[in-house]
Amino acid sequence: MNILKNNSYYFMKLITVCELIILLMSRDIKTRYNGNLLNYMMVLAVPLVWISITVISFQYLNRSVPISTDDISFVIAGILPYLLFRYTITATMRTHSFSTSLAVVSQVKKRHVIFSLAAIEFVNAVIIYIIISLINFLIFSRWEAQKPFLIFEGMVIAWLLGLSFGYFCDALSERFPLVYKAVPVMLRPMFLISAVFYTANELPYSLLSIFSWNPLLHANEIVREGMFEGYHSLYLEPFYPLAFSATLFLAGLIFHLICDTENH
């Protein structure tokens, strides 16, 4: 009987947390976009422009994709996980300012805020993927989703990398405010070393031995294996980005505890 009561208690607590997360997501969307659907659509349009420019540059430079697929599908597989990673970091770095506006609500914890801000970016990425895939199918009759679960897995890993990195940077910023300015600079080379517009299989070993330390490269390769029939990454380590994320979460938690102890 006690087991049933405990299970019921934890289930209700989980429902309460989920409702709180959804409420925080709704509040952030209304605050950021002023409750205007057009503003929200403009935010979604930015990644679409990124993808369009990359596809056009492929065609302009006569860059043939290294996989038997079309340019749009190849670009989606590389650039969307990267954008999800980057936008999730940017979103989670707003945790402090967003939490300050909710300081009077004791029920809201920092972990609720950071998760809700990151969750919005994941939802946005899913919407963008669906929009581009439908356009590609309806206009060019191309649909690449051989293993949907692997696509989802790769996107989740890219999201976790962004969430953990953002959480770690948010913790560092409590002691070192310069982190807010340093993060955008640190993210710039990620576009070049994350296998966004090439595959890991194309890289010579001298470069791969360096780039393979980048966990986002592995997330991109997982998405490619899920999208394209017959593609198999020779250098994929699926557990490495998960271990990397766990390390960042742990380091961020330690920094948060240290800062909280000093503040008290």
From Swiss-Prot:
GO (cellular component) term, any one: ATP-binding cassette (ABC) transporter complex
Keywords per UniProt: Cell inner membrane, Cell membrane, Membrane, Polysaccharide transport, Sugar transport, Transmembrane, Transmembrane helix, Transport
Transmembrane parts of this sequence: 38-58, 65-85, 120-140, 149-169, 176-198, 239-259
One function term, GO molecular function aspect: ABC-type transporter activity
Subcellular location(s) of the protein: Cell inner membrane
Keyword DNA repair in annotation: no
Disulfide pattern: none
GO biological process, one term: lipopolysaccharide transport
Membrane topology: Multi-pass membrane protein
Domain ABC transmembrane type-2, chain residue ranges per copy: 38-259
Task of the protein: May form an ATP-driven Vi polysaccharide export apparatus, in association with the VexA, VexC and VexD proteins.
Family the entry assigns: Belongs to the ABC-2 integral membrane protein family.
Protein name: Vi polysaccharide export inner-membrane protein VexB
UniProt source species: Salmonella typhi
Gene that this polypeptide is encoded by: vexB
